[in-house]
Amino acid sequence: MSFGSVISDARKRRSLSQKELASRIKKEDGTAISPQYLNDLERDRRNPPNQHLLDQLAGQLQLTREYLFYVAGTYPDDLKPAGTESPERVAAAFRAFRRALQK
């Protein structure tokens, strides 16, 4: 499933209109995202948003933030590469992740 379809399906399960959901998601400056921006996200016309918006979408749509980050194809800030991990440790983490998804 694409990021947009996950957002759209979850919004519909919660019986929210795009306008209602958009009004609940606030940018860093405190203003709401526009319904058009949300529509573009749902139709995969825009790249998934930043962590600030992803966290709010997860909360409003009752999705785990981990799943939403996964379908967005990004990492939460606490997992973003800092360049301090060895290549072997990173490879082991990805192998463990793949094994967990295959179960």
For each predicted feature, which ranges?
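DNA major-groove recognition helix of helix-turn-helix/homeodomain DNA-binding modules
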Residues: P49-Y67
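Short alpha-helical "recognition helix" segments of helix-turn-helix
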Residues: L21-I25, L57
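Interfacial/linker helices and their anchor residues that mediate assembly or domain coupling
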Residues: G73-K103
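Alpha-helix N-cap/N′ positions at the starts of helices
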Residues: S2, I33, R89-A92
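A short, Lys/Arg-rich alpha-helix, primarily the initiator
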Residues: M1-L16, S23
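Recognition helix of helix-turn-helix/homeodomain-like DNA-binding domains
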Residues: K26-P48, Y70
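Helix-turn-helix DNA-binding elements, focusing on the entry/boundary residues of the two helices
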Residues: I7, Q18, P35, L54
